[in-house]
Amino acid sequence: MSQLSSTLKRYTESARFTDAPFTKSSYGTYTPSSYGTNLAASFLEKEKFGFKPSPPTSYLTRPRTYGPPSILDYDRGRPLLRPDVIGGGKRAESQTRGTERPSGSGLSGGSGFSYGVTTSSVSYLPVSARDQGVTLTQKKSNSQSDLARDFSSLQTSDSYRLDSGNLGRSPMLARTRKELCALQGLYQAASRSEYLADYLENYGRKASAPQVPTPTPPSRAPEVLSPTYRPSGRYSLWEKGKGQALVSSRSSSPGRDTMNSKSAQGLAGLRNLGNTCFMNSILQCLSNTRELRDYCLQRLYLRDLSHSSRAHTALMEEFAKLIQTIWTSSPNDVVSPSEFKTQIQRYAPRFVGYNQQDAQEFLRFLLDGLHNEVNRVIARPKSNTENLDHLPDDEKGRQMWRKYLEREDSRIGDLFVGQLKSSLTCTDCGYCSTVFDPFWDLSLPITKRGYPEVTLMDCMRLFTKEDVLDGDEKPTCCRCRARKRCIKKFSIQRFPKILVLHLKRFSESRIRTSKLTAFVNFPLRDLDLREFASENTNHAVYNLYAVSNHSGTTMGGHYTAYCRSPVTGEWHTFNDSSVSPMSSSQVRTSDAYLLFYELASPPSRM
C-alpha cells in the first residue's frame, strides 16, 4: 500500500481548472484572485473554483503585505472554499462553510487561513481525525513551495491509501488516465525524497493509529554545534535535476541528518522570489563571512538573544536558520529565502514587495537589524554632552569609542563597525575640530572622466583627500565664531575586522541618474591601508573574500556575487539559484559594486 497526502490530491484538483481570474497586486506580482466577479454565481459551483499556481517570478505562497492595517490583505476576514478531503466514507453532497477563525497578521509567514468545523456542518474528515479536532487549511496557491511545506507537516489523519478499490469507488479520483498519470508521477517524485520516506518510516505505511513522538526535554544551555549542524528551520529546498524535483522542507534533528564536512561547503543557491537578486547577492556574501558564519552555525547568537529582553528577535533567528540551511545543504540544492524576506520587510517596510532595490541599502538595513536584536546592551545610558575637545585626538577617539560601546555592543558590530575621524581646520586661525563617528561601510567616489581604469587605492585617496569648504559650504569656526573657509579631511581611526567598500557607481544630478562603468582594479590580497590611518598602526592589511556585482543600467540590472569559500578557499559565482566555480582571475570586473575585505592576521613576532 502506498500512502499519499491529501496535499497531492488538492494539487491535482486545482490543476483541472484554468479559468480562475487573475489580478495585479500593488507590488507588481500577479496573484490569483480568490474572489472573482462570478463568486456568487451558484453555490453548487464551488467544486469548480480552483486556484492557479503562482507565476514563476514569485515563489511566495500568497501575496504578502506588511504594514498598517489599511494595506493588509484584501482577502482578510473572508471565508475560503473548503477543499475536499477523502477519508473513510462517501463525500457529502452538500458543502457548508465552517466557523471562521481570526486570521493572523501574515507576518509569521503563514500562507493559509484556518477554519474550524461547526457542529451543524457536514464534516469531510474521517471519524478518527474529526475526534482529534483536526482543522483544514486552504492555500491560496498550489505552487511547488506549498507542496514543500505540506510534505513537512503531514498528519496521518490527513492522508489516505491509493488502491484499486478506492479508484473505482471514489468520484473524486475518477479522473482521466492523463490526470492519474500526472498524479502518479508527482507522487513518485515526492516519494524519492528522504524526508517523506522518514515520515512514512516514523508513522508507518498502514492506516494505523497515529504515534505521538516523545518530546525531547529542553536543554539547560544552548548547545554549541559544529559547522556541519543541520538546522531545524522550515526553508524549502529545491534540487537541480530532472525537471527540478521537489524536496521537502528541512525539519530534521541535528543528529540524524548531520552532513560530513566535504558536502557542507555553502554552495547552495538562493531562489529569486521576484527581483530579489540584490538580497541574494548580499546574503551569499554574508554567508561566506567566516566569523559571521560560525556565529550562526554554532548558534552562539542564542546566548545574546537569551540575555536580551527585546520581544523582536525573529530577524536574527531567520537569518541564522538561512545560513545554517545554506551550509548544511548539498551543492545541488536551491534554498528559498521567503521566510527571511518576511522578517526583513517587517523590520524595514521599504523592502515590501518585489521592486528592485539597492544592495548597499539592503546591507545597511540588514546589519542594523541584526545588530539591534543581538545588542548586548539592555538599557542604553542617557547621552551626555561631555566636552572632550581638550583631550589629544588619539585619547578623544578612544573615549568616543568607549561611549559608543556603552550603547551599541554586539557581535555584528564587532565584525563590521570601524571608526572614522573627520577634521575641520580653519584657514584663518588654524583651529582644528575633530569628530569621531562609527561606520559600517565606506562609500568611495570614482573618477568620472578621463580615466578608463582606476585603482582601488585611487578611490581611497579621493575619499580621504583634503577638501576645501568655501562659499555656501563654509562651516562656523568655534574660535572665530563666524563662518570661515575650512579644510576637511577624513582618516580611519579604527579599522574593522570586515571592511565593506562601496564603489559609488551611481551618480545623481538634477536631470538624471547615471551609472559609472569604469573598471576599478582592486587587489585580491594584501590591500594595505596604513597610509589612510589617523595614527600609526601595522594592522591594516586586508584580503578580499566577496564581491557584490551589479550589471546593467540605472533603469534595470541584475546582482550577482563572487565569493571565496572560508573552508576551501575556492571562488564561486552565485547567480541566484545557480552556483558555479570560477577562477580568481575572473573576480575583477567593471560590475564590482560592493567589496568585502577581511582583516588579515597580524604578523607573528619572532
From Swiss-Prot:
The active site is at residues 277, 558. Residues 90-100 have a biased composition (Basic and acidic residues). SUPFAM superfamilies: Cysteine proteinases. Its EC number is 3.4.19.12. One of its GO terms (biological process) is locomotor rhythm. Pfam families: UCH (PF00443). It comes from the Eukaryota. Residues 53-112, 207-228 are annotated as: Disordered. GO terms for cellular component: cytoplasm; perinuclear region of cytoplasm. Keywords: Biological rhythms, Cell cycle, Cytoplasm, Hydrolase, Metal-binding, Myogenesis, Protease, Thiol protease, Ubl conjugation pathway, Zinc, Zinc-finger. It catalyses: Thiol-dependent hydrolysis of ester, thioester, amide, peptide and isopeptide bonds formed by the C-terminal Gly of ubiquitin (a 76-residue protein attached to proteins as an intracellular targeting signal). Its main location: cytoplasm. Cleavage is inhibited by ubiquitin in a dosage-dependent manner. Cleavage is blocked by ubiquitin aldehyde. Residues 268-600 form the USP domain. One of its GO terms (molecular function) is zinc ion binding. Belongs to the peptidase C19 family. USP2 subfamily. This is Ubiquitin carboxyl-terminal hydrolase 2. The lineage of its organism: Eukaryota, Metazoa, Chordata, Craniata, Vertebrata.
